[in-house]
A protein has these predicted regions:
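Conserved glycine-rich cofactor-binding loop
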Residues: 9, 16-18
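Short, small/polar-rich loop/turn modules that mediate ligand/substrate recognition or access, typified
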Residues: 86, 173, 178, 233-235
């Protein structure tokens, strides 16, 4: 599977840390030419240096279509085109529904949902020229499948991403571009670690595999969607959650 990614041009938005960094690492190790994008160019460059394998960092803002158009051109110019977009950029600041402000709602929607639209729209002209155009969206089990208190805005954007994906895959099929999504459960990232050790233990205990996922787990799922082995797969999702959404797991979590 990894052989089909060798030499392919890949852009990972939100790739300087967390899940995005894991995705970038997996693709780079598979021989792809990886561009890591972050709102902070220095962080993207630092992540690229750490990952190696010819990866490079670039600054960009998914909340701006003009910024994403500039990023796509820069990546295509440097890598000789664009084959894979991993639309991963996202934020998840907690806010309870009754206390949430309109500004808090808009910030998450602008980054997670509108940012996905901007990224995909800007990538289309370049993906159309690829013989293996791929779009892989990082969604979540929160929103599309289950809910999580304190993240109403986040869940809404993640459900929205799947609605976007299921229509975009139909519109872009005529160009041979596939559009799929990976739905992570609880993955060990800087954000999860910041919630405290007890939170991590509670989440791990609620998962049938009795452990949390690592960022590379999401990277391997994204790698499959981007590979030639997934040529006939579009409009689909892969849930990477260790079995967390199984009924027994949700019951255990509710009782925790």
């Amino acid at each position: 599977m990894t052989q089909s990614l060798k030499g392919r041009s890949v852009l990972v938005t939100g790739g300087s840390k967390g899940i995005g960094k894991g995705i970038a690492r997996v693709f780079a190790e598979a021989g792809a030419k990886v561009a890591i994008m972050s709102r902070h160019a220095d962080q993207a460059e630092a992540a690229a240096k750490e990952i190696g394998h010819g990866a490079f960092g670039i600054g960009g803002d998914v909340t701006s279509l003009a910024s994403m158009e500039s990023v796509m051109k820069a990546v295509a110019d440097r890598n000789g085109g664009l084959d894979v977009l991993c639309a991963n950029a996202g934020i998840f600041p907690p806010a309870k529904l009754e206390e949430m402000t309109g500004e808090q709602w808009d910030e998450v929607v602008d980054t997670n949902l509108k940012g996905t639209f901007h990224s995909v729209k800007a990538a289309i002209p370049y993906l159309k020229n690829s013989d293996q155009g791929r779009i892989v969206i990082t969604s979540s089990i929160t929103g599309p499948i289950t809910g999580f208190p304190g993240w109403t805005h986040y869940g809404a954007t993640k459900a929205g991403q799947l609605g976007f994906m299921r229509t975009a895959c139909i519109e872009l099929a005529k160009y041979g571009i596939t559009v799929n999504a990976v739905l992570p459960g609880n993955i060990v990232t800087e954000g999860l670690i910041s919630m405290g050790e007890e939170y991590g233990k509670t989440m791990a205990a609620s998962v049938p595999l009795k452990k949390l996922g690592v960022v590379e787990d999401i990277g391997y799922a994204a790698l499959y969607f981007a590979s030639k082995e997934a040529n006939y797969v579009t409009g689909q999702t892969i849930i990477v959650d260790g079995g967390q959404i199984l009924p027994e797991s949700l019951e255990a979590l509710a009782q925790a």
